[in-house]
């Protein structure tokens, strides 16, 4: 009795294994496949509609009949039938055929106006014996003590300079010498430059110009002095023994 049961189970297992091998050896019929009665992948002839509707009959992900990832029938990654990476056919890698070269950035053109402007702002003026040109400032509102001069200044202030020439503050002993030199060179340079253009200055213009430039030179001195002391403080801080020791220890930890 036991032997008959064992024989029955062996027969059932044998039939099941044989059926499984037979199913594995069968080839899939054309048009049949996973979850559909059509192709192997979804989206190619599914009776219930495509999840990703095709655009011209190709493999999965082929909107126009090319290989995988070929929207217009080229090789892999060829959207319009050229070589790999050719968007519109023809040419070697990175060549766009009828279009410009693909993914090749154009060479930037140098703007000479920007170069000249960057060189002029804060640069050393060689023709003025090493003076530097400060940044542009708003012309100060100054009262000269009478209505005529106040009105004259408001009407002609655009003719006066809005930048000053100066040397580094460490070349002067105090603010007065800096301002005196700054006023002289700025007024002289502006007067000469403007006169060559056919415009003359009266004594009133020179008087007002000196007052305006003096205020701007004081402002320039304050800016330069603050920047100079900040640079000096940074140098002193990083040159102190505790800071040097700390930096050396950190470098040792990073390298080690």
UniProtKB/Swiss-Prot annotation:
Residues in Sequence repeats: 54-62, 63-70, 71-78, 79-86, 87-95
Region Interaction with GRB2, ERI3 and SYN1: start-end pairs: 25-233
Molecular function, one GO term: copper ion binding
Binding site for Cu(2+) 4: 88, 90-91
Region (Disordered): 28-110
Region (5 X 8 AA tandem repeats of P-H-G-G-G-W-G-Q): 54-95
A Pfam short name: Prion_octapep
Main location: membrane
PANTHER family attached to this UniProt entry: DOPPEL PRION, MAJOR PRION PROTEIN
Family: Belongs to the prion family.
Protein name: Major prion protein
Organism whose genome encodes this protein: Cervus elaphus nelsoni (Rocky Mountain elk)
């Amino acid at each position: 009795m036991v032997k008959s049961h064992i024989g029955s189970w062996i027969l059932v297992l044998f039939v099941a294994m044989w059926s499984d091998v037979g199913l594995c050896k069968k080839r899939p019929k054309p048009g049949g496949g996973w979850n559909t009665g059509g192709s192997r992948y979804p989206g190619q002839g599914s009776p219930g509609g495509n999840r990703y509707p095709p655009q011209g009959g190709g493999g999965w992900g082929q909107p126009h009949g090319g290989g995988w990832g070929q929207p217009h029938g080229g090789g892999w990654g060829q959207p319009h039938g050229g070589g790999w990476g050719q968007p519109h056919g023809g040419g070697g890698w990175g060549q766009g055929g009828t279009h410009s070269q693909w993914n090749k950035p154009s060479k930037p053109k140098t703007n000479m106006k920007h170069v000249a402007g960057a060189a002029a702002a804060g640069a050393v003026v060689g023709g003025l014996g090493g003076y530097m040109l400060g940044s542009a400032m708003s012309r100060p509102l100054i009262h000269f003590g009478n209505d005529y001069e106040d009105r004259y200044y408001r009407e002609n202030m655009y003719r006066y300079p809005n930048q000053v020439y100066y040397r580094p503050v460490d070349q002067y002993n105090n603010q007065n010498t800096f301002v005196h030199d700054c006023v002289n060179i700025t007024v002289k340079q502006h007067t000469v430059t403007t006169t060559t253009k056919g415009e003359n200055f009266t004594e009133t213009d020179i008087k007002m110009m000196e007052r305006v430039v003096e205020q701007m030179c004081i402002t320039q001195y304050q800016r330069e002095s603050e920047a100079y002391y900040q640079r000096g403080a940074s140098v002193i801080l990083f040159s102190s023994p505790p800071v040097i020791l700390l930096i050396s220890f950190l470098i040792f930890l990073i390298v080690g």
